């Protein structure tokens, strides 16, 4: 009862958990865009969140899939569980809010009008939704600067059924450096790369000035140290010598990366767009080496519960 009262006060009903990202069936979900005149399109390798307030998804579509002006008025995104072609775990009804041309195709921007989540029994899910509404209602009082709406919190939780790998992003310009964790990143099937960084982040100015980014995969074993970097991210610059994790320089740009990181990726920024609460960096990969290994990722708690009820599982690093 005490736990329930605590939940009701804080409103934290839609939870997320850090997990170990793995090459396994539990992470091999399919994401399908439906409602287009050309028929359903598998966009599993072509989507990324680009804003949190409002919650906006970017979906890359090839020119052959969308004729100019032919985008359906009410498309929807479906997330399918491993080895299933029939019933989606979640369905997000989309509302088109824009389009950004890319080197290959275009990035279509969508807000989420409605969310259906099948990971939990309906009574349990509606209790979680009630708590999410309470969380949104008290956001200003709690000092939550992002203040996502209850609708967007529901959409975000369903979208994170597809785990988001975490990277340490290294940036620098004019003797200022920063290193911070991000999961709003996405490698597209076209070879292009997206990163969405909160507009208030000091890292935005550094990236805009240098047009360069270095990324290293965040090891699951360094969970606490990775989150500590996130807590220090508001500082104007970061003293890399005082960090508790070993840091080295990326081979191409000389930007800070995790020493002996499994994967190091270096990007050149080609375009910058401000979308809602975030700044979207559209980039190309200049250099990549290594493998991710046991990488930290974030996953929806509702999907973790679904896996457990289905006698499946993944390595969860913190209690739900």
Task: For every predicted segment, state its role.
Residues 1-320:
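Basic, polyanion-binding surface patches
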